[in-house]
Regions:
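N-terminal secretory signal peptides that target proteins for export/translocation
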Residues: 1-30
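Active-site-adjacent loops and short helices of periplasmic peptidoglycan-processing enzymes
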Residues: 2-4, 50-200, 207-213
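Bacterial N-terminal signal peptides
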Residues: 35-47
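Domain-terminus/edge residues, biased toward the C-terminal soluble/receptor-binding domains
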Residues: 180-183, 191-308
Length: 308
């Protein structure tokens, strides 16, 4: 399959003309820089190019992109909106769940039994039945790729016995990661009173999660097949449809609940450049993500030092 960049990928994916987030129309180096300046973005661009490691209030380059978003280019926070505003996490919380599970006495081959409560979890789910068993690593794959809540619940019950006990461990780990504006109530990211996070904290979480080889390998897969211990074969696709469709995208996680809206954390690498993107409540998250990543790599290439 031909890998596409920017809006062309969305055109093929959605079968309609792609729309970028509200931004520039020009792509040449001079025109793009002029557009930055005309829109009032020159100061943020210069700060990014100068090597600032953090920006307290990044430029809101894409006001229509999402309720909250953050864009980090080559380790520097470049653009964002409402990055410290509390938002529901949706299934992005499962990245923290995976970290806590892997930090425990993780045995990927251990048998995970599905309880009645796990089997009754709301969508998204695999359709596991009470009494089913599957390997821990297969349940982890389903949780991270498909956002399967039944697999998530089964893993958590096996590891901690209850959601409440596991949520306490999640909050301890979040504190260690510097996620000071986050609080978790359940491990699957379902809407719940008191459960909230921010775009800035989710950026920290995703980067920490990607340091775990088991997580990095899983979130970069386009599809997977697993078998229950009773021999039932299950096949599913990754919820992140950018994978395999947009050049350089290698992760990380999508999510949706009625309170959180459509959410996405994406990681893309092209040559020496790396872009992290967090979108929270973005109705057109795939088109928005494609447009932002396209322009982020454009900026990174322009700001790179000239070869000697």
């Amino acid at each position: 399959m031909q890998l596409l960049s920017g809006p062309r990928f969305v055109s093929r994916l959605l079968g309609r003309k792609a729309q970028r987030p509200r931004s520039t129309r020009a792509h040449s180096s001079g025109a793009l820089r002029a557009a930055f300046a005309a829109a009032g973005f020159a100061a943020a661009t210069l700060a990014w190019a100068a090597g600032a490691s953090a920006v307290a209030s990044p430029v809101d380059r894409y006001p229509s992109a999402a309720a909250a978003y953050a864009v980090q280019i080559d380790g520097r926070l470049a653009w964002g909106r409402a990055i410290d505003t509390p938002r529901a996490p949706a299934s992005l919380a499962k990245l923290l769940t995976a970290i806590v599970l892997l930090d425990k006495n993780w045995d990927p081959k251990s048998a995970i039994r599905v309880s009645e409560s796990a089997a009754a979890m709301p969508a998204v789910h695999l359709g596991l039945r009470a009494g089913d068993s599957l390997r821990a690593d297969d349940a982890m794959t389903a949780m991270l790729m498909r956002s399967a809540n039944d697999a998530c619940a089964a893993l958590v019950e096996h590891a901690a016995g209850s959601f409440a006990r596991f949520a306490h461990e999640m909050n301890e780990r979040a504190h260690e990661l510097g996620m000071s504006a986050s609080h978790f109530v359940n491990p699957c990211g379902l809407d719940a009173a008191g459960q909230h996070t921010t775009a800035r904290d989710l950026l920290r979480l995703a980067q920490a999660a990607y340091e775990y080889p088991a997580i990095a390998a899983t979130v970069g897969r386009r599809n997977a097949s697993i078998d229950t211990m009773a021999g039932e074969h299950l096949h599913f696709d990754n919820g992140n449809v950018l994978l395999g469709q947009m050049d350089g995208v290698i992760g990380v996680k999508s999510g949706f609940t009625s309170e959180a809206g459509r959410c996405l954390i994406a990681l893309a690498r092209r040559g020496p450049h790396e872009v992290w993107l967090v979108l929270l409540d973005s109705p057109n998250r795939w088109g928005v993500a494609a447009g932002i990543l396209f322009e982020a790599f454009d900026l990174a290439a322009q700001s790179a030092p000239a070869a000697p």
